Amino acid sequence: MYKRQIFDNKAMGFSYTRINNPTIEAFEKRITKLEEGFSSVACSSGMAAIFNSIANIVRQGDEVVASCGLYGGTVELFEDLESFGITVKYVADNKPECFEELITDKTRVVFAETIGNPKLDVTDIKAVADVAHAHGIPLIVDNTVSTPYLIQPITLGADVVVNSSSKYINGSSDAISGILTFNGKFKFDKEKYPGLKPYLKFGPMAYIIKLRNGLFRNTGGCLSPQNAFLNNLGLETLGLRMERHCSNAYELARYLDTFEGITVNYPGLESSPYHEVADKQFTKGYGAIITFRVGSKERAFKIINALKIPNIVSNIGDTKTLVIHPASTIALHLSDKDKEASGVYDDLIRVSVGIEDIDDLKEDFRAVLESTDNE
């Protein structure tokens, strides 16, 4: 029977929506092409995509080397991994040599973000990929903040790319979703990755087939077809939106940088310690997230509450400008040490810049910053 061949991985087809689905596949194929990858698996959220990408190839006793400044949710996920006997080590700095220092014979994954959130640190993907590959280890990169519009990590050496497609890919905050994309080129050593050994006969599809027929299927972290449909709609305007997002963010960052009493962090500013790497990797913009410190937690709250255009929301990537106080929201449960490593401070405000008229945004921030200047 043809259906049996599908279940036995001897024929292509759809077996069950928890594993695959035509609408979801259409979304996966689009992302695969945008990321210049080989194959993708869409998940219920960005966190599910990160978990599946790593858990597919690690087991108890293995180690993960991760970049500093990771998104708080990812840090908390990695704490959960440690409860399964998987050790996560964080580099002190995202320089390639810092990754090299932490890699041991137990390391099975190197993990990084193209742009950290909210630290906004930028990883040199090619340099870190070279370090990982020298040890026979895949590099997994979270491309959520950049999107494939700004950078395609696979072309720089990344082996797996994850996106929280709830953000810029969707663009309207109407669907929680995530997706991982494999390059189809990384050669997994059967001794180092014994869980993949039975699947190596599938060649470049080994990583994906193992995932679909194991962890992904059995944990139920699949994307709903409706959310895949909404993401497909979002993809149709991704390029236009990202162009406006990035130009607005660059202009707003430069404008905010003229105010005394605040410190602006944005990779597009020459004052950013990551500007040189960002300039090398990004050709169409520096992303659409800005953070700035205002001197005190009290002033940060006053500014956030007084702004008229932005919504106070913990999400990023919406067409609308969004502001949040990370220390009391998305990073609330992190330790003080982890907050500092993630670039989170009590007086920090994060802005996900939308596609509104830039002059309107400037005027809104000007009025609020000036009114709170002496408070």
For the regions a protein language model found, what residue spans apply to each?
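Conserved N-terminal alpha-helix of the aminotransferase class I/II PLP-enzyme fold
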Residues: 3-51, 73-80
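Short amphipathic alpha-helical segments
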Residues: 12, 176, 227, 231, ...
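Short glycine-enriched loop/turn motifs at secondary-structure junctions
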Residues: 34-35, 82, 173-174, 284-286, ...
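PLP-dependent enzyme catalytic core of the Aspartate aminotransferase-like
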Residues: 38, 79-80, 87-89, 101, ...
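Conserved PLP-enzyme active-site core in the AAT-like
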Residues: 40-259, 265
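Generic non-transmembrane alpha-helical segments
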Residues: 131, 251, 255-259, 302, ...
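Conserved C-terminal alpha-helix-loop-beta "cap" of PLP-dependent enzymes
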Residues: 257, 263-349, 353
